[in-house]
């Protein structure tokens, strides 16, 4: 059975599952240098994605559209070719505790001039299904709790097993968007008005708070205002909780909360305010999760899946894991809406077969497009060993291999790789990518050696937990050590068949260092490079390696290694 999952709104994507196996997931931002969080505005994108894999719409048994904003149903205005189309979808959240798999049956999905029927499941259903079905718990036939938190919903706790899923409770009345909203009131991303949201702010705040310290007085202010605005018995808080299905009302309440916070905290350093708010939410999350586990004592292993945009917060993920409440914690590489097309397809699979495991690979995104070297570049075959030698000479390389990784983080398929041994390399990479100076660069490390370098250094193939750099390694790999000593580590097993694994092995043989800097290969504000030509046209890194071919700028004869002053003279990073 072929099931095609579709996410139309931000982080638009098309995913195809065939007989329990993920065939592909095409996130629109990873096509043609599209903007981050690209929507699907034209249904022709679905036809194109299928055609690229030798299929047409008639080959699909079921189309599934991810639900969206709305208490009873959602609406989508799109095009099919040049014709406007209105589609109806399921709401954001299920309407009753056992209603995760209640579908809306729709028609009017026009693909290749054919009018097709479709199903739609609540948006949150997709998060639960994608997190659980890709988890090791599903594969082992074990039940799991599932935490979904993001957007305009409270943190929602579910229990899932192979037979079904049930909503248990909301942990506390704070929407996931509140974390990003804090950045619009304090710090470098402060905005003069309530209008507009930067979907990337939350990740930037996690980096920025490394400049700060937690102030318990500030935390106390947030606790007081939280009770007044959200959790207490006052009329304002009760009204807020009564309107939880109204995204606009929830956002207004969050803005009011931060307006009051600004008045109370105007004399405090903004970086300390943001760090303290992060700490306040982390403590709240851990405390309320512990209480929920006392209320829901269920037989079997205590496993936890985490989904929703807040699942990208590596510090909160680690805090939950470190509580000891759970035997194991799983976060998929796409906990945010980048996984919603997969989630929509998994929802339909669950409706047919139960919450069964999905066979999948993180490298199931778009394939690299073929193309010649643009003018000014030379192309030549290049082995992995030769590439490792270039990296060992302190020259960064755009590394493009195989199909793109799923989710928002570069995992070695669409990466800029570099030696981590130079203290200037982090600044250099941030400069060429137009990123703020405080942004970290992640290490990609051989899994078996990660515990020697990082604490805990446990397997982390998708960069979703927090690690500290061990003191004896900080001076050896300064480019991947964040301001607070942490590292957003990606581990990769020596048994992996991905090309980046062989590269790490060869680089370790040359240098004794089993890791490299790893940051995403993309235009500023855009998705991953779709091909080598796009990386060459960008041109801010002089070497581009793509599936065994090295593209080199013709003007590059013998550049000084990074760290030499003349090589650091580049356009100023926006602040």
UniProtKB/Swiss-Prot annotation:
GO molecular function terms listed in the Swiss-Prot or TrEMBL record: transferase activity
Keyword Transferase: yes
SUPFAM superfamilies registered for this protein in UniProt: Actin-like ATPase domain
A Pfam family per the record: Carbam_trans_N
Keyword Transferase listed: yes
GO BP field: biosynthetic process
Keywords associated with the record: Nodulation, Plasmid, Transferase
Protein EC: 2.1.3.-
Function: Involved in 6-O-carbamoylation of Nod-factors.
Protein family according to the UniProt entry: Belongs to the NodU/CmcH family.
Protein name according to UniProt: Nodulation protein U
Source species: Rhizobium tropici
């Amino acid at each position: 059975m072929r099931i095609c999952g579709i996410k139309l709104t931000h982080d638009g994507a098309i995913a195809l599952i065939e007989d329990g196996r993920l065939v592909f997931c095409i996130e629109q931002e990873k096509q043609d240098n599209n903007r981050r969080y690209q929507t699907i505005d034209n249904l022709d994108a679905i036809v194109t994605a299928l055609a690229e894999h030798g299929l047409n719409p008639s080959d699909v048994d079921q189309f599934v559209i991810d639900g969206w904003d709305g208490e009873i149903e959602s609406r989508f205005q799109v095009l099919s070719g040049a014709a406007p189309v209105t589609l109806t979808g399921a709401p954001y959240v299920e309407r009753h505790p056992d209603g995760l798999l209640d579908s809306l049956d729709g028609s009017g999905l026009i693909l290749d001039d054919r009018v097709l029927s479709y199903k739609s499941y609540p948006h949150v259903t997709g998060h639960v299904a994608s997190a659980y079905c890709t988890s090791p718990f599903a594969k082992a036939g074990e039940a799991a709790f599932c935490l979904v938190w993001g957007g305009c919903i409270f943190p929602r706790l579910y229990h899932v097993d192979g037979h079904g899923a049930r909503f248990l409770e909301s942990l506390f009345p704070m929407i996931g968007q509140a974390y990003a909203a804090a950045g619009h009131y304090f710090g470098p991303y402060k905005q003069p008005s309530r209008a507009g949201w930067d979907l990337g702010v939350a990740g930037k705040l996690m980096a920025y708070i490394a400049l700060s310290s937690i102030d318990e007085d500030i935390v106390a202010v947030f606790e007081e205002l939280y009770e007044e605005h959200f959790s207490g018995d006052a009329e304002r808080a009760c009204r807020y909780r009564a309107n939880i299905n109204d995204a606009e009302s929830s956002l207004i309440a969050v803005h009011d909360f931060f307006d009051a916070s600004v008045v109370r905290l105007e004399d405090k350093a903004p970086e300390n305010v943001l760090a303290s708010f992060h700490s306040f939410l982390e403590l709240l999350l851990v405390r309320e999760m512990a209480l929920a586990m006392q209320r829901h004592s269920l037989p079997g292993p205590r496993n936890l899946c985490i989904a929703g945009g807040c699942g990208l917060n590596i510090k909160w993920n680690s805090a939950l894991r470190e509580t000891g409440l759970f035997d194991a914690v799983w976060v998929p590489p796409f906990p945010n809406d980048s996984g919603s097309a997969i989630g929509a397809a998994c929802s339909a699979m669950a409706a047919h077969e139960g919450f069964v495991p999905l066979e999948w690979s993180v490298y199931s995104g778009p394939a690299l497009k073929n193309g010649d070297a643009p003018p000014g570049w030379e192309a030549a075959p290049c082995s992995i060993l030769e590439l490792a030698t270039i990296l060992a000479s302190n020259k960064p390389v755009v590394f493009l291999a195989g199909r793109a990784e799923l989710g928002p983080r570069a995992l070695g398929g669409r990466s800029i790789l570099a030696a981590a041994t130079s203290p200037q390399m982090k600044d250099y990479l941030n400069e060429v990518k137009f990123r703020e100076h405080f942004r970290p660069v992640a290490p990609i490390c051989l899994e078996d050696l990660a515990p020697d370098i990082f604490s805990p250094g446990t397997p982390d193939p998708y960069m979703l937990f927090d690690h500290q750099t061990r003191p004896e390694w900080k001076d050896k790999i300064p480019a991947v050590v964040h301001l607070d000593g942490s590292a957003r580590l990606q581990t990769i097993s020596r048994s992996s068949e991905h090309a980046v694994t062989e590269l790490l092995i060869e680089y370790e043989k040359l240098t004794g260092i089993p890791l490299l800097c790893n940051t995403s290969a993309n235009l500023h504000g855009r998705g991953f490079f779709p091909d080598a030509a796009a990386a060459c046209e960008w041109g801010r890194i002089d070497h581009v390696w793509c599936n065994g071919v090295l593209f080199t700028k013709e003007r590059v004869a013998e550049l000084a290694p990074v760290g030499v002053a003349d090589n650091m003279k580049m356009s100023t990073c926006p602040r």
